[in-house]
Amino acid sequence: MDSDLDRILPIASRALLCEGNRDWAGAYVSYCKVLEEMKKSSAARDRMGLGPLTGAEACSWNGLYDNCLSKASKLRKTILESEMERQNYQLAAKLSKKAPVDLHPLRPVRSQTPAYTPMTTRMMYRQTRGAQSEVNLSTPKQIYSKHSPPSTSTSSIVSSSYGDAPSYLAPSKPNRSPPLKPEDPFASFNSSASAIAAASKSAAASASALSSDTGRSATMNSTTFPTAMKSQSTTKPTLSNSVSSPSIQVSNNQNANNSTPLSFHAPIPPLHVPAVPLTSASHSSSDGKSRKHPSPYKPYLNSSHDTLGSSTRPSSADTAGSPATSPPATADSKTIVSKTISASTTQQTEPLQQTTPSSDFEYAIMNEIISNHEPVYWSDIAGLDDAKNSLKEAVIYPFLRPELFQGLREPVQGMLLFGPPGTGKTMLARAVATEAKATFFSISASSLTSKYLGDSEKLVRALFEVAKRQTCSVIFVDEIDSILSARNDSGNEHESSRRLKTEFLIQWSSLTNAAPDKQTGHSPRVLVLAATNLPWCIDEAARRRFVKRTYIPLPEKETRYKHLSHLLHNQVHCLTEEDLEELVNLTEGYSGSDITALAKDAAMGPLRNLGDALLTTSAEMIPPISLNHFKASLRTIRPSVSQEGIHRYEEWNKQFGSQR
């Protein structure tokens, strides 16, 4: 059960974080992953012969499953209805089932758009009359509606879509007939081509009525439909049976029945991006099949986590100024959207504008942001207490409590982790990405180099510009010596490499003079975290900017014991405490990666002894791992770090390292 929680809760936390940032597509994919992991856990319990859980655990997990399923359905409907509205489609409350047409993915096509663009999903409705319409499922922050009221956030733009727009443009007549309960037209991806065509005419007529009411255009006699659909004159239809898009209830500062029309902004064209094939998560979640769990019970969380777990919920520093995490609920035909938007809703548009890329270089940098990585926690790393405390002091505490770290307590903006290979430097950086609740940029030499003259410097500038727009950012550069190696006058260094180093150092220094945020008054929190196996190869100017230089040594005796115990925790072995103590003494001088390789090789020992009998032996009859298997593997797996290399690291640490 604990392993299920460790695998599911970080994904659920990432879904909440995406909702807080109004990334509906990312939240939808994360919720689908949560449901998939829950189903896998349930199937595993079935195979093990375990009965269904009862009591508080059952109620807690059932609530989690139903909540994720409901949110995923609402997010899917929100994204699809918003795109259909943007493509001038009007959906009826109940579509015909006579001519079902499935939704097919397109193959990736070659596009002239620059390569530095985010991934989106492109779908196509194949209609019976030969008319085709493409629907781009972009992120909601790129979706704009020509019916949106002024000074609204992205969620308000989505909410003021085709179904709700006429309700506040003009007073509608009361509907005497009982209200229709809108059905989800996307519960099954089968729709009628004739119904879609009729809905398109309704959308065109409603757009004509909106234009005449606001005084923007004289008339709309014809509408051009997307992708090879002929223009034809339309008449204004009734909207009593139309399905309204999901709406967000806002503050009612004015009466909803007031007939004064609102002014509208000019429509903003959407951003076109190249098409890519569907991912497994998004395609499996859009197949229209039932979401019921196959087993009679559902895998469970502890009762202390009511919805998605409070232990991994994003901190207040991340969700400050972000919208409510629940997707908009679907409104019926009588729902009336308020004309006024509260001040808090208006202020929520600023983070979206700040994080929107303004160039292809910023697109490339945003692709380096780690969002879907396997979480690593401090408890997963054995030993290295000094390094953990230094990282908490430099990253975790200042990012979570920025009001306490000001003036002389302002955190450092550069930290270097150096030491022999395989000691856990990159693992510490991954733990920082999980624990800090900050935007984590994983940068390598390939992220900042380009074959075009001057593009490398622009990529470096875009990296720091995007990082400064975030509330808290960590720029992790693995193998920093490949980017900021020592400069020399021997002529062996290329001019482009020298310009790249100079630009990186200049942008790094600009973090100190960055202007504070107008709302919070705090300067942007950006930390450059680097790791290297060759600290003596780093340029002196870069070494000065790394205020803290922490040495990551080889694991000590106690650390090796914890590491071996963790590796053998889920394995069938017959090692006693005395055997582990002897094994710890035999692995003197081994790094963390060497010990992991040794344990893997020893685990293969029982299988090697079986030989060809392995093909007919059941898993229960395989012998356990013993000390003799480890001793045999010690002759094969040797230490990767020499004593001369360790001595050199210790000398550099004495001269330049941060001693505690």
Curated annotation (Swiss-Prot):
Its main location: nucleus. Residues 213-239, 301-313 have a biased composition (Polar residues). It comes from Schizosaccharomyces pombe (strain 972 / ATCC 24843) (Fission yeast). Signal peptide: none annotated. The keyword ATP-binding applies. ATP binds at G419, P420, P421, G422, T423, G424, K425, T426. Belongs to the AAA ATPase family. The keyword Phosphoprotein applies. One of its GO terms (molecular function) is ATP binding. It holds the Pfam family AAA_lid_3. SMART domains: AAA (SM00382). Keywords: ATP-binding, Nucleotide-binding, Nucleus, Phosphoprotein. Residues 145-161, 240-255, 314-333 have a biased composition (Low complexity). One of its GO terms (biological process) is microtubule bundle formation. The modification Phosphoserine is found at S177. InterPro entries: AAA+_ATPase, AAA_lid_3, ATPase_AAA_core, ATPase_AAA_CS, MT-severing_AAA_ATPase, P-loop_NTPase, Spast_Vps4_C. This is ATPase-like fidgetin. Residues 141-186, 209-334 are annotated as: Disordered. GO terms for cellular component: cell division site; cell tip; medial cortex septin ring; new growing cell tip; nucleus; old growing cell tip.
